[in-house]
């Protein structure tokens, strides 16, 4: 027991004496009688002090054990009164014996309390005894245990031998039935609380509740001031001891009540007793004998439990039997989670009736349970210090968290809609709320472009960082903390103007010269400095006006250039597009509508028009071009009902593009289960609370059909909904998706290229012939796949296209002899498709971006890796062999992730397999991992981010583990891992984080199939491709993720290969396919020819690695921009 508790008990004793004196004066007792009465009180007080001293001494903790309750447990000892002549030294009110075997004689007056009923209402049940004199109405109400005391075993249940009794004496006449207490002295009221009143001889039990106001007292062991809180009620009298906002646990009086607290429900709080949980008085008096056995036990009478999930709980309701005048308690079961469904039903009702929902309707359920949070700080402290049965502090749960958790279920229902509350808006969006803009209204700082001198200086510092990194690489005694020991014991630092603060005895540099602030007197302001500042910021007014006029975004094209053309539908947009986008815009209009002149257009378009293909290089703005076209097309043909089909990873990109350019046209994403807010009101009203996937999709389809809007859907979902012919309930989806679209847009249009696939067959059944195919890599593997794509885009020319490509494929199979004929037929095919295929080879990227450098790096494997590569069984399945070859060429331990054949088990052996397990985190045992880890570390010193591609997730995870072990990095911070199993929303967060220049991410490990199309990864300037794939377009798409509009740095591409493997042969075949693709889809415009000048002439990171003494042995050969002659050369 601490000092605070001792002082509190001493103050309580003084307060009792003071109250006794006031009571005696009110009764007219003389001083002598008062002294006699004080003698008895002093005797009891002295015994109480002895108990208090015993309680101050710590007692050994005993193992707590729960026992089964007996029928006599509801008998509680109240007091002992001695007639005249009894010894005064007997223990007054001792309750150390077993309660169930004791019955005390009070001289024909017995007081039996029902423990269970007292637990419910925190009040005592008084027996019917007649007071003999004026002091008989002073009773010993009960004892309150110390906070850490528990029931120990079966023999001392309800023991209070170590408890200091607390006695409160009240005059029956002074205690008002209306619940008003006598005011306490301001000096001595710290420990006294009003517990209640006991009916007298001639007063009926029910008269206690005759008043309309009943006192509800807040009692807590630590509430030393004994503050009262009065509530207005008709019948309820309750004593509450909780100050928690969320639980309102009940204070248990007496020794039996502490047994309930120390039981298994102790850590979840005591029973909730609020005004709604009690319909009648829960503490009525029932006169029974002490040996009565038909009293209901607390287990069957009232049980309250509350799980942490906000689950079920039992509320006690009281029913009165008029004949017996006994209150029986009946359990009623309610569900706390029912509120979630109430909110959902309320929101659904508001959606159906199109009316607002007010806060008081939604949150009215929790008004009753809320407690005034302005309680005394001492009470708060006491509540937080309560312990559970395991001796651990009880977890304090915030009430607003429970409300927030309940609201989440409602949010998931209506998918981010907004409900109005008068003028206040309640946003239930499940999207993460945007961060607060603390600089709102402030002028954004102007970015000052560095001068050539500053750029050169930065380049020198980066070179120095690379040199320092290479110098400390692969050291025999690496230092984890970055501190070097000096040869002289301690460093002696001097300032070198070129290096910094370095040691004179060793090469250790404590502070680099770039981090040392120069003396201020060297840089005093001058006239030249003022001129530089005025040039960078605060330009004169004419210069600023001239700059604004040159901004393409603020320029509105004159009507002379666009009058009478389709550009008039989107004024001010033409000059914001690149030249190849302007050409593509007019090309689409000519193919779909026949002309670009408004007066020649009709409501149905030109007869005989068909689809077209926009074959612009990846990263040149095909999505932006298509959005502008749809905006203009819907202004002329608002009932055309365009539908966009794209890979699932690009649906979010389309939504962002439509929102970014302020098209003001609804975009309904069929893959999302959230309503956009632009859906048709009548269609939404038909939901009637049904949030099934297909129900929401049908609402979007109906809204798309009724309004001028765009429908977006992914390839897999379109295949699922449109291909089900016989499934019940799916025919309507098929009919709407196949027959209703008036314009079809296929992003990554090369996806449906296999005529045996279901998606290709479904798309051939689409009724409209107005189709737009977007693809930067139209030629994939062979001419047959190209023919399938061209026939989908132009169904009217299907026969002509098929015959021409069939002849071309024959020539390609003849080898070298048929190469001349092949080139001639490619020219004919190119001329045939020129009127519906618009090609741009990406010259805009070479003109506007810093540059691109592509190279093939051939590496020498170490001994262990080469041994595993040589023992791979080449006679197995082709796909299994390719997987093992790609995995082992990265690191030999990846062989354990493959399925070995019987031959491989015999050749490699268990001993080698055990060695591979130990080599997993040793990155230097694999030549590709050795190159990659060192390359990433060096790139980090020059603040360049690395993008790593691989076909296999096991390979990416191994690299991540090695980076964590070697560089002490963390996944999600410095390392990002993105593959097909990552959710779409998480992918977008990773992309945004990686593209931020000031983020801590250093490397992105990406799956080739999941991250090679449609996304922008311009944050990376170094791209490493670990595997060689057969399809050349896969690598082209992967490279275009970094080399695209928005890139600020020169981009370097590294194709890693291992010497003496089949990777080089695969790369040569891939390059041949790429050559054919360039022949077919080359631009006929001389201005659009690719630039052959090598923009990037130096790769300082790779050059430093090749010259480094400990790294140069891993390099066999490096080919920059491999030529045709290199494809026919085998240097392995």
Swiss-Prot record:
Its EC number is 3.6.4.-. It is an enzyme of class 3 (hydrolase). Residues 603-796 form the Helicase ATP-binding domain. Residues 934-1087 form the Helicase C-terminal domain. Keywords: ATP-binding, DNA-binding, Helicase, Hydrolase, Nucleotide-binding, Nucleus. InterPro entries: CLSY/DRD1, Helicase_ATP-bd, Helicase_C-like, P-loop_NTPase, SNF2-like_sf, SNF2/RAD54-like_C, SNF2_N. It holds the Pfam family SNF2-rel_dom. One of its GO terms (cellular component) is nucleus. ATP binds at residues 616-623. Residues 233-242 have a biased composition (Low complexity). Belongs to the SNF2/RAD54 helicase family. This is SNF2 domain-containing protein CLASSY 4. It comes from Arabidopsis thaliana.
